[in-house]
């Protein structure tokens, strides 16, 4: 069997920054460091940070007063920020800057009293944080996941409306939903460019090319990773078998029946070393050659907070 690697795959700049913030906080301040929610949605990464002294919690009520807490890459609501301030918690914010950009759009709509529509997945921490930027009772923010949800929106055609999206959605599904929104609300405003981030976009485009060449597409990523799930769904939509896997032990022999070419990609929160360990396991199942596709090389970089830059600390 032949292995073809998608390009780009794996860590994006926002994930890289978030992990670095936890690592640097541990290095400078020592354990324990509290992290609200999994800093990124990857079990391998989270377990590694936990072993080094990070304590992952879901609510700030689990964090002692005055302790250091890190907000995950997915962002948090204004209410969570205020709670941290009220309790004198030392906060390092690992929110991806591209998520912060969406937060600013929502906050702007809230200040103006413009009703906002967020396209995203209910219950996802990024969505909860984004919804929590809106506080104006004279307006409102409404969540939709798919085209069918639009019919249930309470707004009128001539209402002052704006929309924004979660950063890790399917490009195809989101384009369809935005088109339907604009059809129902012709005057609705939105970002000049959709909010789906560069890493999500590039990785989905890479999977399109990968699926054309593969009998099976393996996506390295955790089940709670939105962008990883979208990659697996896209491959399936293109008529190729796909599997989402968290670690080498997830691999099953019957996946490879009638498979000559295996395509491999990785979600934006999956480290390269995990991908390499999966490739090593695939060799035991008969994979004997590896090819990497050409693709858009990521050159985006997001700086960590000033207080965590080692040279400036020293």
UniProtKB/Swiss-Prot annotation:
Summarizing the function annotation, the protein's role is:
Catalyzes the conversion of 1-hydroxy-2-methyl-2-(E)-butenyl 4-diphosphate (HMBPP) into a mixture of isopentenyl diphosphate (IPP) and dimethylallyl diphosphate (DMAPP). Acts in the terminal step of the DOXP/MEP pathway for isoprenoid precursor biosynthesis.
Catalytic residues as annotated in Swiss-Prot or TrEMBL: 126 (proton donor)
Q: How is the cofactor bound?
A: Binds 1 [4Fe-4S] cluster per subunit.
Which positions in this protein are listed as binding [4Fe-4S] cluster? Answer: 12, 96, 197
One Gene Ontology cellular component term attached to this UniProt record is: cytosol
Write out the pathway annotation from the protein's UniProt entry: Isoprenoid biosynthesis; dimethylallyl diphosphate biosynthesis; dimethylallyl diphosphate from (2E)-4-hydroxy-3-methylbutenyl diphosphate: step 1/1; Isoprenoid biosynthesis; isopentenyl diphosphate biosynthesis via DXP pathway; isopentenyl diphosphate from 1-deoxy-D-xylulose 5-phosphate: step 6/6
Family per UniProt? Belongs to the IspH family.
Which GO BP terms apply? dimethylallyl diphosphate biosynthetic process; isopentenyl diphosphate biosynthetic process, methylerythritol 4-phosphate pathway; terpenoid biosynthetic process
This protein's cofactor list reads: [4Fe-4S] cluster
Which annotated residues bind isopentenyl diphosphate? 41, 74, 124, 225-227, 269
Say if the entry is tagged with keyword RNA-binding: no
Catalyzed reactions per annotation: isopentenyl diphosphate + 2 oxidized [2Fe-2S]-[ferredoxin] + H2O = (2E)-4-hydroxy-3-methylbut-2-enyl diphosphate + 2 reduced [2Fe-2S]-[ferredoxin] + 2 H(+); dimethylallyl diphosphate + 2 oxidized [2Fe-2S]-[ferredoxin] + H2O = (2E)-4-hydroxy-3-methylbut-2-enyl diphosphate + 2 reduced [2Fe-2S]-[ferredoxin] + 2 H(+)
| Keywords assigned | 4Fe-4S, Iron, Iron-sulfur, Isoprene biosynthesis, Metal-binding, Oxidoreductase
Q: Which Pfam families match?
A: LYTB
Binding-site residues for (2E)-4-hydroxy-3-methylbut-2-enyl diphosphate, renumbered to this chain: 41, 74, 124, 167, 225-227, 269
| Residues binding dimethylallyl diphosphate, per UniProt | 41, 74, 124, 225-227, 269
The family database entries (InterPro entries) matched by this protein are listed as:
LytB/IspH
Q: What is its EC number?
A: 1.17.7.4
Q: CDD domains of this UniProt entry?
A: lytB_ispH (cd13944)
Q: Which GO terms describe its molecular function?
A: 4 iron, 4 sulfur cluster binding; 4-hydroxy-3-methylbut-2-enyl diphosphate reductase activity; metal ion binding
User: What protein name is recorded for this chain?
Assistant: 4-hydroxy-3-methylbut-2-enyl diphosphate reductase
């Amino acid at each position: 069997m032949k292995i073809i690697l998608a390009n780009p795959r794996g860590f994006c700049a926002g994930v890289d920054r978030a992990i670095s913030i936890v690592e640097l906080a541990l290095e400078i301040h020592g354990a324990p460091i509290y992290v609200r929610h999994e800093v990124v949605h990857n079990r391998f990464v989270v377990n590694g940070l936990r072993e080094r002294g990070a304590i992952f919690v879901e609510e700030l009520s689990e964090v002692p007063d005055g302790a250091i807490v890190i907000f995950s890459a997915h962002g948090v609501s204004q209410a969570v920020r205020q709670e941290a301030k009220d309790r004198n918690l030392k906060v390092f914010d690992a929110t991806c800057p591209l998520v912060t950009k969406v937060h600013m759009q929502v906050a702007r709509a809230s200040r103006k009293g413009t009703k906002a529509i967020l396209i995203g997945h209910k219950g996802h921490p990024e969505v909860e944080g984004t919804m929590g930027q809106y506080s104006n009772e004279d307006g409102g923010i409404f969540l939709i996941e798919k085209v069918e949800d639009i019919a249930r929106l309470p707004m009128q055609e001539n209402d002052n409306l704006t929309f924004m999206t979660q950063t890790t959605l399917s490009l195809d599904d989101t384009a369809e939903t935005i088109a339907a929104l604009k059809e129902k609300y012709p005057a609705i405003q939105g970002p000049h460019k959709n909010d789906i981030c560069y890493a999500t976009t590039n990785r989905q485009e890479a999977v399109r090319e990968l699926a054309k060449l593969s009998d099976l597409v393996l996506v390295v990523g955790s089940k709670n990773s939105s962008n990883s799930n979208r990659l697996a769904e896209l491959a399936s939509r293109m008529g190729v078998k796909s599997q989402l896997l968290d670690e080498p032990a997830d691999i099953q022999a019957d996946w490879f029946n009638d498979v000559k070419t295996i395509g491999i990609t990785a979600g934006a929160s999956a480290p390269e070393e995990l991908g390499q360990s999966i490739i090593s396991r695939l060799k035991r199942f008969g994979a004997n050659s590896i090819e990497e596709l050409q693709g858009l090389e990521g050159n985006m970089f997001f700086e960590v907070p000033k207080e965590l830059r080692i040279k400036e600390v020293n």
